[in-house]
């Protein structure tokens, strides 16, 4: 619950502690890279069992700033992208809107309204959709500012870390290789015609004449 001040305070403390770890990880990555991860695995069975993390640290060393810069970025991040992210999360989690349900108008938190998207009653699903369309624009400016600030910070840091493209940094963060990502994208593209046919059939079953309505999507 984002309204619990004690929880918010503890989260801030955790973020400060996490920021202290960043320069230490940068130092560890440089150390692993200087010794070579493949050579380190020969030191012991334990090292060999952790070759994967060692290789990731070695790759990280290629794409990181100096230890001091990484430490400064981590500290600034607590009042930068992290703060913007929490603002967006707090605003959206505390958002409420009136939903004109068949049983009467009811004020509901946006998360509960989102849950009505799978209700069996068409009238309920449509009422929930219309309520969402009324609610989200009221926080659009704040959410856009938060997302732009987070993305802007990421783009700046990724350049300093010498990533060729933002997608490369994202793939590394998620432990996904370029080959795997390409294969996933190809699989999605190949399945889109079948997916579109399924959407058209579902629209017909619901009686939609101009494409599948959002409230019938789920």
Name every feature range the model reports, one short phrase each.
Residues 1-218:
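A well-structured
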């Amino acid at each position: 619950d984002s309204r619990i001040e004690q929880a918010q305070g503890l989260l801030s403390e955790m973020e400060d502690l996490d920021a202290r770890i960043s320069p230490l990880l940068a130092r560890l990555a440089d150390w692993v890279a200087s010794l070579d991860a493949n050579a380190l695995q020969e030191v012991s069975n334990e090292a060999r069992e952790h070759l994967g993390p060692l290789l990731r640290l070695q790759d990280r060393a290629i794409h990181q700033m100096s230890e001091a810069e990484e430490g400064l970025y981590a500290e600034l991040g607590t009042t930068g992208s992290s703060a913007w992210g929490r603002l967006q999360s707090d605003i959206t989690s505390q958002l409420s809107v009136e939903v004109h349900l068949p049983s009467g108008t009811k004020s509901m938190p946006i998360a509960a309204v989102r849950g009505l998207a799978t209700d069996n009653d068409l009238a309920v699903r449509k009422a929930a959709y219309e309520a969402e369309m009324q609610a989200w624009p009221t926080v659009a400016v704040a959410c856009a500012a938060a997302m732009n600030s987070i993305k802007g910070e990421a783009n700046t840091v990724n350049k300093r870390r010498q990533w060729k493209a933002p997608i490369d940094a994202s793939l590394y963060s998620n432990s996904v290789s370029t080959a795997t990502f390409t294969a996933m994208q190809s699989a999605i593209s190949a399945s889109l015609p079948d997916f579109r046919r399924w959407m058209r059939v579902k629209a017909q079953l619901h009686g939609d004449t101009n494409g599948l309505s959002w409230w019938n999507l789920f």
